[in-house]
Amino acid sequence: MLALSRKLNESIMLGNDIEITILEIKGDQVKIGIKAPKSVPIYRKEIYLQIQESNKEAIDGGVSLEAISKLF
């Protein structure tokens, strides 16, 4: 993992088109801004993990193709 130090209003570039800027620092919280193309999904990690778990449950849900075909 690369660890970088940034001060208020300083940025980090990821590739050519993603910019992460430090917007605010209050106590132990840091507010960041992210400029990225709309095609790049951006999630907080806890939300990303929930999405992954939901996708896994959907796959493992035991719904058969036969049951799905009966819906149509």
Swiss-Prot record:
Cell compartments where the protein resides: Cytoplasm
Keyword DNA-binding: no
Paired cysteines (S-S): none
A GO term from the CC aspect: cytosol
Main location: cytoplasm
GO molecular function, one term: mRNA 5'-UTR binding
SUPFAM superfamilies in the cross-refs: CsrA-like
GO biological process, one term: regulation of carbohydrate metabolic process
Keywords, ordered alphabetically: Bacterial flagellum biogenesis, Cytoplasm, Repressor, RNA-binding, Translation regulation
Xref: HAMAP family: CsrA
Function recorded in the entry: A translational regulator that binds mRNA to regulate translation initiation and/or mRNA stability. Usually binds in the 5'-UTR at or near the Shine-Dalgarno sequence preventing ribosome-binding, thus repressing translation. Its main target seems to be the major flagellin gene, while its function is anatagonized by FliW.
Self-association and partners: Homodimer; the beta-strands of each monomer intercalate to form a hydrophobic core, while the alpha-helices form wings that extend away from the core.
Similarity annotation: Belongs to the CsrA/RsmA family.
Protein name listed in UniProt: Translational regulator CsrA
The species this protein was found in: Lachnoclostridium phytofermentans (strain ATCC 700394 / DSM 18823 / ISDg)
Classification lineage: Bacteria, Bacillati, Bacillota, Clostridia, Lachnospirales
